[in-house]
């Protein structure tokens, strides 16, 4: 194994899974992360997941979890965001939803039933950006262009590109904004009112950290230190399908569904397998969140104490 990707002995990565139940009612159990579980782990990488048949495999460590039902509309997830209150928001094919990561309960946010492509925002804020297509109740032009919300997704306003651009990937740190519509990158320094051409690169996911703009490309992870105008390949990174980060570090999920974490993008630690998740985001405290159509995973990285 490439030593730059090998899990280091001083790091523990744990996951709590909140998975969909059978939808028939019944008792609901709240997922609780127990510190003793982490202490008991003899391996350096632990995955806290569910013991039911839908659980991810435990090749990288020990697994336990709790399963609770999720609402059906959370299929076709296009993005996740942690708002100012710490609530996890999910952009879907049929609107914006909140997810209670302790119980798995979801609720619609606002009145829109639009297709929320590229949902994102500066982590820990109520300032969101999105693109996509109008829903059944909307008469907005298709595609929606760049939209923004200042109230956590309750209401939305059009910023630019209405009727012309569908951003499938968006990333912002609150100052810079980078977007991809499948025809190269576009960059903005005024919240998406005006745009400038960026690198001519195909990306599947974008995130912005203090170290630069990170992108998942067909050739692997790459980083830009000039606001998205050019990118440099990061050979130490695993073959990621999703990436997200803040000043507290980076999270990634590879094509096989394994989770990776990195403090700086130079060295990566491999965690357990969460499977075919559709979206990934990072909270302001460094916690990661990944979601599939029927489960949400809370990802934590902590220093081992013994």
Model regions and ranges:
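Surface loop/turn motifs at the tips and blade-to-blade linkers of beta-strand repeat domains
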Residues: 69-73, 109-112, 160-163, 196-201, ...
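C-terminal motif of bacterial Sec signal peptides marking the signal peptidase cleavage site
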Residues: 46-49
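Blade-level signature of beta-propeller repeat domains, shared across WD40, Kelch, NHL, RCC1
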Residues: 281-306
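Short, solvent-exposed loop/turn segments at conserved positions within beta-propeller repeat blades
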Residues: 137-143, 180, 216
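Asp-box/BNR beta-propeller loop motif
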Residues: 95-109, 143-159, 186-197, 222-233, ...
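Bacterial signal peptide processing site
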Residues: 51-53
